[in-house]
Amino acid sequence: ASDLMRAFEDKSISAIICAIGGDDTVRILPYVNFDIIKNNPKIFMGYSDTTINHLMMYKAGLVSYYGPSVMCEFGEYVRMPDYTKNAVKNILFKNSAGFSVKSSSEWSDDYVVWDENNINVSKKMRREKHGYEILQGFGTVSGHLLGGCIDVFPMAIGTEIWPDLEQWRGAI
């Protein structure tokens, strides 16, 4: 928690991008100073287990970005996928009041083990054939996005960072 608080207080740091997940992050909650986060807004990006951090940002009134981590995308062997690279550029470096999330033309479920035998080995990419699949409802939606890794939610329920019912109302 002290590292996170120092990063928020440090005026020379403009973004905090998670290296990878952090399934024990919920344990630092008693030591988080939400006023420090609120009064020192920064770009915060990560995904999966960093859902706890995103809920911290939400409680402090900050927008956070559920997106790539250093090890899993920025540090991708050979290159970061174009879709991810373009999304990061568009979301973080262009002034825009809103944006549309378009379907990627390619995807991967491949995992390349980080070891010396795989230097210069890229994930195998697959061509997307269908675009988005709507699982519930229909058409285009808009609104505030509130979510994260569903496996992490049970760790947050009942804590001070869990959004109340009104905050979930109308959320995507």
What name fits each language-model region?
Residues 17, 45, 171-172:
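Structural motif
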Residues 29, 56-59, 76-79:
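Short acidic, glycine/serine/threonine-rich loops at helix termini
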Residues 32-57, 63-71:
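Short, acidic/small-residue loops that bind anionic groups at enzyme active sites
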Residues 65-151:
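Conserved anion/nucleotide-ligand pocket segment
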Residues 25, 53-54, 154:
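Short, well-ordered alpha-helical microsegments
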Residues 145-172:
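Oxyanion-binding "anion nests"
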Residues 1-40:
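N-terminal small/polar loop signature for handling phosphorylated ligands or for N-terminal nucleophile
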